A protein has these predicted regions:
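An aromatic- and glycine-enriched ligand-binding surface/loop that stacks and positions planar moieties
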Residues: 1-153
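Active-site beta-strand/loop architecture of penicillin-binding DD-peptidases
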Residues: 146-177
Length: 177
């Protein structure tokens, strides 16, 4: 196809805003906020096999995976095996996550592009540590919690995605429900 021209882009943006306002005003959907689960609930929406039952007020569209119905995926393999594409986020994307007090990360440090990784992940919107491997990130492997640091052989930028990654490391080479 041909690229959009500026007027078309603005028209589509306005259509999107109008549609979103209708959804918000309908009252059918609400954002999930369980204060006791804030450290995990965002990622849980993408990894919990029962998410479509738990987060019914937030999901507008969801795909439920079910091994009995042969509706599965191999996403874990794509997120941990180098032969599948080496997905990673870049620093500009990570910088869009605010600090926990709502201020931009980029205004917190004069040298924000050169702070160490641990500092970069500290005091941020909790969704950041539910999106990338971070200091302290663990997964379950054969019944034990195991630390998983960012794998620079996989995520060349150091920002290794985890948002959709199952906590069960034994699923990395299997089809996941």
């Amino acid at each position: 196809g041909k690229p959009w021209i500026a007027d078309e882009a603005k028209m589509y943006l306005n259509e999107c805003v109008d549609a979103c306002e209708k959804i918000i005003k309908s009252g059918v959907y609400t954002l999930t906020d369980n204060p006791a689960a804030r450290a995990t609930q965002y990622r849980d929406m993408f990894t919990n096999s029962k998410a479509s039952e738990i987060y019914t007020n937030e999901f507008i569209w969801a795909r439920t995976y079910n091994a009995e119905l042969s509706v599965t995926h191999i996403f874990n393999s794509y997120m941990v095996n180098v032969q599948y594409g080496n997905y990673s986020f870049n620093r500009d994307f990570v910088n869009t996550y605010l600090m926990s007090d709502g201020t931009p990360f980029t205004t917190k440090f004069a040298n924000y592009n050169s702070v160490d990784f641990k500092t970069e992940c500290t005091g941020r919107d909790l969704r950041l540590t539910q999106t990338i491997r971070h200091p302290g990130f663990t997964r379950n492997k054969n019944g034990a919690k195991v630390a998983f640091a960012p794998d620079l052989g996989f995520a060349k930028t150091g920002y290794h995605p985890i948002k959709w990654l199952s906590d069960d490391a034994t699923m990395d080479t299997n089809t996941s429900p």
